[in-house]
């Protein structure tokens, strides 16, 4: 650590206990982050931290970023958020769903501090929310999966039965079916975002069921390692996982928070920030498709990229009718597109998936 | 339908980290020491093993280094409990905290690197899996048929008596703690080198705690550890297999079941010992108690 | 008005009942209370997870796991008593618990029995102390305390039951008890010390940009030293004179 930083850190200490930041004009904008995992998790938190680094790179001396990592959801989160606010951060990013209520509570106590909460649905005057349309990426994965499977069985390792994951399962299934009407989808729930041993077991269970393409919604590389052993293929999740390329990792779905973070910090700097809910996808650069490797035939790659482009241009929505619910009742009529409200509360599988969502 | 053999083969490899860690803890506990730091030793082993395997390109050297690292970090616990007479439960918890932090700190440069490939052994199953299974009869033999094992059990049952008979209680216990650390280290390294093929912070994700439960379930026998590891691992593997086959399963209840089974086993064995005064063993007599020679 | 006190009572009762499981298994069958309660930790976690995904799931929560947030129901919440301090009713209750435990252990005959049974079980038995009663009393009481601690968290800072509720506070409490040398006031101080390392750890991340792992290592080492040097307070070092 250099001397300037040390001085800066000493300067913070007297500021603790004051609710409002002092000298906001002269000083660089302080941006705080609270992470649910360690920055070294190679997945969710790692990607958010890349976003933080992108802010520093973009704005240089005009911003100063700090983070607190591995904060458990629940009681500890509120304390950590208060500390970030007390330390003079004017913009705070809370990057896990479980931080939702703590953010709302702390935001009420610090009306001058702006909060950004990832993946939640509660907003306030000074609390904005943001999320990424991961299902758009899943549509591309589903297309590749449907084309690549030889056993016509694809597997999905779910973390928790929440709307984001259910969207992902539906989206990948719909698009796999579109290119391969015989495809079947097997779903297992790991009940964890990160548990390598269990994820490996989940992948093995799918492989033993005859699955040869695995989509994962959990963050470790264990399913890819299992896929490699069994000669199956899979996709990187959250981060690129490119060290498993070209096979078993044939592509990946990457969370890229940098564009959003840079945009929002810029808005705070020029005074145009306001609370809103942002749900961007491939078009906004939030959801990236990692390089499709040579293990995928060229025409499949082309088809996948074409789908990606049509989603990016807004020409195509992955949830476009006709689509029925699992029980056969009609959900979307021909040409009808799912609304964001429907998607953000999604709690059913589409027709054709045989697995049940656990109650 | 679900083919039992495939479930079993899956189970063999899935339960290996826990088999190692639990066998190590078994020996430690039979010497009368309750080390709750298994999770911490496992993750240190996972990191050290991965680092060594990556640096040398040899998974085998990785496992050796993991064993050494696990044993080394367990010596802090040995120091505290055997020389400084600190409480074993608290020291073990501190060891877990320390190990998790230490591994995370030193693991930073290794993030995102892939482990070197391993040559599979018989039945396309990793050699380490077979080694874990081979350790079961070896440890059984050591505990029940060898003189050294007899002394170790004596120390664990009644350290005052063992001391009076002239056995070096402290040395026996330190050795047992070190062995437990080495085994936990290998178990952790199996996760990073053979299952995930990558180092990630916090990758043991509670495996050490399961190993502790299995030792209780095993009624402190080597064969029981294997049965316990297969039961605990089996429940997970089976519920995932059922899910994959499209059967709805009550996951929370299923994953609770092995722990309830452990309590029932513990109660049955204790009751047998209490009321019949014959056979049946429960926890080693001096488990968790510190020893100091009065003279 | 009465809802929150009733919740505290129910929390204590729940903790007491959970604590009585190892106590009774110990008394009836001689099963080790350490091991039984260790196993019960996992069972309790699964029960909480089941509740968060099942019966207690917030119907307005868009399918996310977790109960309704109690902070939005003033009658059932445990708010900050003094704004900005984070102090809630749990702080008051903890202070009272320290006093009550001190009185129990140092001034009450039952506390004397507990200490006697801890130091010399056989002697205590001869003096007419029934170990079964003590086991049930102590485990039940500590269960009730732990239950209240959980309730104050769930109704206060955490606000809701989630699948990850708990995050290791119970194990930290064991460390605190030993650091406090099993004395109520010592435990209060040890609790404050550990809390300081948590908060200080976050501050260190913020101001010095240390990774969380450094803080964890520091905590581990702090505990090692404190536990290790406890020896010097309990034993006197003596130079052995060899003739």
Annotate the PLM regions.
Chain A
Residues 24-359:
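A residue-level marker of the well-folded mature domains of exported/periplasmic proteins
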């Amino acid at each position: 650590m250099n001397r300037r930083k040390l001085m800066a850190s000493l300067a913070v200490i007297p500021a603790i206990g004051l609710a409002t930041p002092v000298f906001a004009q002269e000083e660089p904008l302080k941006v705080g982050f609270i992470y649910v995992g360690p920055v070294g998790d190679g997945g969710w938190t790692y990607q958010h931290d890349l976003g933080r680094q992108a802010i520093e790179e973009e704005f240089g001396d005009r911003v100063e970023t700090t983070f607190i990592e591995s904060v458990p959801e629940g009681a500890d989160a509120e304390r950590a958020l208060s500390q970030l606010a007390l330390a003079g951060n004017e913009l705070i990013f809370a990057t896990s769903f479980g931080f939702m209520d703590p953010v709302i509570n702390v935001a009420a106590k610090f009306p001058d501090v702006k909060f950004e909460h990832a993946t939640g649905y509660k907003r306030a005057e000074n609390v904005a929310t943001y999320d990424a349309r991961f299902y758009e990426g899943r549509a591309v994965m589903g297309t590749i999966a449907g084309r690549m499977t030889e056993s016509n069985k694809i597997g999905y390792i779910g973390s928790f039965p929440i709307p984001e994951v259910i969207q992902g399962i539906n989206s990948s299934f719909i698009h796999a079916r579109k290119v391969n009407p015989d495809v079947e989808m097997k779903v297992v729930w790991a009940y964890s975002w990160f548990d390598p041993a269990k994820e490996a077991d989940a992948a093995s269970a799918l492989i033993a069921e005859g699955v040869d393409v695995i989509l994962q919604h959990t963050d470790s590389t264990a399913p890819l390692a299992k896929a490699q052993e069994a000669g199956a293929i899979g996709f990187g999740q959250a981060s690129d996982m490119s060290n498993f390329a070209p096979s078993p990792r044939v592509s990946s779905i990457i969370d890229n928070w940098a564009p959003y973070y840079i945009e929002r910090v810029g808005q705070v700097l020029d005074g145009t920030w306001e609370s809103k809910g942002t749900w961007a996808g491939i078009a906004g650069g939030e959801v990236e498709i990692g390089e499709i490797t040579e293990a995928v035939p060229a025409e499949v790659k082309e088809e996948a990229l074409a789908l990606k482009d049509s989603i990016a241009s807004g020409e195509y929505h992955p949830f476009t009718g006709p689509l029925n619910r699992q029980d056969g009742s009609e959900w979307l009529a021909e040409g009808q597109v799912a609304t964001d409200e429907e998607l953000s509360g999604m709690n059913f599988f589409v027709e054709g998936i045989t697995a049940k969502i656990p109650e | 339908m679900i083919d039992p053999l495939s479930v079993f083969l899956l189970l063999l490899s899935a339960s290996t980290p826990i088999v190692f860690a639990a066998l190590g803890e078994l020996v430690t506990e039979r010497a009368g020491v309750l080390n709750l730091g298994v999770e911490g030793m496992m993750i240190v082993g996972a990191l050290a093993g991965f680092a060594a395997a990556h640096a040398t390109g040899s998974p085998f050297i990785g496992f050796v280094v993991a064993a050494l690292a696990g044993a080394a970090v367990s010596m802090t616990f040995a120091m505290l409990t055997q020389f400084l007479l600190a409480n074993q439960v608290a020291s073990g918890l501190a060891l877990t905290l320390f190990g998790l932090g230490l591994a995370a700190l030193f693991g930073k440069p290794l993030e995102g690197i892939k482990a070197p490939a391993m040559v599979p052994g018989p039945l396309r199953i990793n050699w380490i899996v077979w080694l874990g299974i081979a350790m079961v009869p070896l440890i059984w033999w050591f505990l029940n048929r060898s003189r050294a094992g007899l002394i170790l059990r004596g120390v664990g049952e009644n350290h005052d008596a063992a001391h009076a008979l002239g056995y070096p209680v402290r040395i026996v216990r330190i050795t047992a703690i070190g062995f437990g650390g080495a085994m936990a280290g290998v178990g952790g390294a199996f996760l990073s080198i053979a299952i995930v093929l990558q180092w990630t912070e916090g990758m043991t994700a509670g495996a050490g705690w399961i190993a502790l439960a299995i030792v209780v379930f095993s009624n402190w026998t080597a064969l029981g550890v294997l049965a316990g590891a297969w039961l605990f691992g089996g429940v997970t593997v089976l519920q995932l297999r059922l899910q994959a086959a499209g059967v709805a399963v009550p996951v929370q209840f299923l994953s609770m079941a092995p722990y309830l089974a452990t309590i029932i086993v513990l109660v049955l064995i204790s009751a047998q010992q209490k009321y019949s005064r014959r056979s049946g063993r429960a926890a080693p007599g001096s488990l968790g108690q510190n020893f100091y020679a009065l003279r | 008005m009465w809802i929150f006190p009733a919740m505290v009572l129910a929390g204590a009762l729940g903790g007491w009942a959970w604590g009585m499981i190892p106590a009774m298994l110990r008394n009836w069958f001689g099963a080790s209370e350490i091991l039984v309660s260790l196993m019960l930790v996992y069972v309790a976690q699964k029960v909480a997870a089941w509740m968060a995904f099942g019966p207690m799931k917030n119907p307005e929560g868009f399918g996310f796991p977790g109960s309704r947030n109690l902070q939005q129901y003033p009658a059932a919440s445990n708010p900050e008593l003094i704004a900005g301090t984070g102090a809630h009713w749990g702080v008051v209750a903890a202070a009272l618990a320290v006093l009550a435990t001190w009185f129990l252990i140092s001034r009450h005959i039952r506390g004397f029995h507990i200490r006697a049974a801890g130091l010399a079980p056989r002697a205590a038995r001869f003096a007419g102390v029934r170990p079964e009663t003590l086991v049930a009393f102590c485990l039940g009481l500590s269960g009730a305390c732990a239950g209240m601690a959980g309730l104050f968290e769930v109704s206060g800072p955490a606000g809701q039951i989630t699948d990850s509720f708990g995050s290791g506070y119970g194990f930290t409490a064991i460390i605190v008890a030993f650091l406090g040398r099993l004395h109520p006031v010592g435990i209060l101080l040890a609790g404050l010390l550990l809390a300081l390392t948590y908060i200080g750890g976050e501050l260190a991340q913020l101001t010095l940009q240390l990774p969380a792992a450094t803080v964890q290592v520091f905590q581990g080492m702090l505990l090692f030293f404190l536990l290790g040097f406890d020896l010097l307070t309990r034993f006197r070092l003596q130079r052995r004179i060899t003739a």
